[in-house]
């Protein structure tokens, strides 16, 4: 008899996601043994002839997007797995920079459900297996995997990377990864492989990353030592052991991440022309990362949710021509460094619009206000955003930040407004 509690291949995606959220006893359960067993049964441990794996506290998404953009410009068929999503689950898997239909995801979930037997999987492990299965079906040239949490014990690390990338190291997820940059660096370097390039974009690299590279006999390529970049006026220059690339176009993604992606591409040995590099760098853009949505007032969406990302965001804001005020809509998760994140932003924000985030991890607006001397409390992200937009004059900037969830809420409200107006 059919088990009504387990969705089928033809079930709606929402039914599957609800099922996956309640499948495992723990939301996060670090370790590769269970998920690797199921991956072996599905034969997805080699999802493509060439694999990049990208870890790091911040900058993973834009580094992956730059890799994808340049490789596609060079003629490769590329798949990207990233998380979390902003609005739709299907954002997590891209093939040739396009999302797949929900039916493809539900078909993959049904395959995993059949293969896992009695093995319990977390939501993220299920999603990772699904991405690998979808990539295998698509017969790709290159797959780019964004690590979910850490590196060493993350589900993506069941796949052997041909090039491993660590974008940056800062304090985040300390409950899982350790209390300092050295312990976090060791976890992230767990994606390194013997005799394979290990590209590090963090300029202040923890010693543990070099230790792991030595232990694993990985080929460490460090920013500022083995490769470097320099921004000049309206162009930039990249150099490594292979030589220099001059007069590169400035990227739309953060400069360090574009440079890290370029270092990884050049270390890969894949054939990529200089023209593909130039075209790919110019075309790479990722929603929610210093995304300027509109002007008058200027609306900027950024998922910055820790001090490292907030400091970068503050710097970007300072680099813009100063016109009016900066009104910030903020919602955060309570397990983040709220005080440290807001402190990095206080010098550039004139007025705060504090909103709670739903769910057990969401911080209340009152918790945010404890760290701020100025601002107002609202009952939802949507209400805070509407209030900020109503208060903003044409010369002002409205910034939405603090979490993927905060940005996603505003994007959904904006989409609903556009749809409602049709």
Annotate each PLM feature.
Residues 1-27:
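Charged, amphipathic alpha-helical linker segments immediately N-terminal to NTP-binding catalytic cores
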Residues 12, 26-28, 32-49, 73-159, ...:
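ATP-dependent carboxylate-amine ligase catalytic core
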Residues 48-50, 137, 142-147, 154-165, ...:
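Nucleotide phosphate-binding/pyrophosphate-handling subdomain across enzymes
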Residues 50-54, 62-79:
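A conserved segment at the C-terminal end of the G1
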Residues 81-84, 200-202, 214-231, 248-252, ...:
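Beta-strand->loop->alpha-helix junctions that form or flank phosphate-binding loops
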Residues 84, 88, 127-176, 207-245:
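Extended acidic/charged loop-beta regions that coordinate divalent cations
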Residues 185-194:
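Membrane-proximal helix-turn-helix segments that form the acceptor-binding/catalytic region
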Residues 199-217, 232-235, 266, 298-299, ...:
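C-terminal helical cap/extension that packs against the catalytic core
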């Amino acid at each position: 008899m059919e088990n009504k509690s387990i969705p089928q291949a033809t079930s709606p995606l929402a039914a599957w996601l609800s099922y996956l959220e309640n499948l495992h006893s723990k939301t996060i359960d670090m370790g590769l043994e269970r998920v690797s067993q199921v991956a072996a049964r599905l034969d997805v441990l080699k999802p493509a002839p060439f694999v990049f794996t990208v870890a790091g506290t911040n900058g993973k998404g834009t580094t992956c997007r730059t890799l994808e953009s340049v490789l596609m410009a060079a003629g490769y068929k590329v798949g990207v797995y990233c998380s979390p999503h902003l609005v739709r689950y299907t954002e997590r898997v891209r093939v040739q920079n396009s999302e797949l239909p929900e039916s493809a995801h539900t078909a993959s979930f049904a395959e995993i459900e059949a293969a896992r037997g009695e093995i319990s999987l977390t939501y993220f492990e299920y999603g990772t297996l699904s991405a690998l299965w979808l990539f295998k079906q698509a017969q790709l040239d290159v797959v780019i995997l964004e690590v979910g949490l850490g590196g060493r014990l993350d589900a993506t690390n069941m796949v052997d990377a041909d090039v491993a990338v660590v974008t940056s190291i800062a304090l985040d997820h300390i409950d899982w990864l350790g209390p300092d940059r050295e312990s976090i660096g060791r976890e992230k370097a767990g994606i390194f492989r013997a005799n394979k390039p290990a590209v590090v974009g963090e300029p202040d690299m923890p010693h543990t990353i070099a230790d792991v590279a030595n232990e694993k006999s990985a080929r460490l390529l460090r920013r500022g030592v083995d490769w470097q970049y320099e921004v000049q006026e309206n162009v930039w220059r990249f150099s490594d052991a292979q030589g220099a690339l001059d007069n590169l176009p400035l990227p739309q993604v953060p400069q360090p991440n574009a440079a890290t992606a370029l270092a990884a591409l050049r270390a890969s040995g894949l054939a990529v022309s200089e023209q593909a590099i130039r075209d790919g760098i110019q075309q790479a853009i990722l929603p929610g990362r210093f995304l300027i949505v509109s002007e008058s007032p200027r609306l900027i969406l950024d998922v910055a949710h820790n001090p490292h990302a907030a400091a970068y965001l503050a710097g970007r804001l300072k680099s813009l021509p100063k016109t009016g005020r900066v009104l910030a809509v903020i919602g955060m998760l309570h397990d983040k460094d709220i005080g440290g994140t807001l402190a990095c932003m206080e010098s550039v924000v004139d007025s705060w619009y504090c909103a709670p985030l739903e769910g057990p991890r969401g911080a209340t607006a009152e918790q945010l206000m404890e760290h701020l001397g100025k601002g107002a409390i609202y009952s939802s992200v949507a209400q805070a955003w509407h209030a900020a937009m109503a208060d903003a004059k044409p010369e002002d900037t409205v910034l939405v930040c603090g979490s993927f969830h905060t940005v996603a809420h505003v994007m959904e409200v904006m989409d609903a407004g556009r749809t409602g107006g049709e």
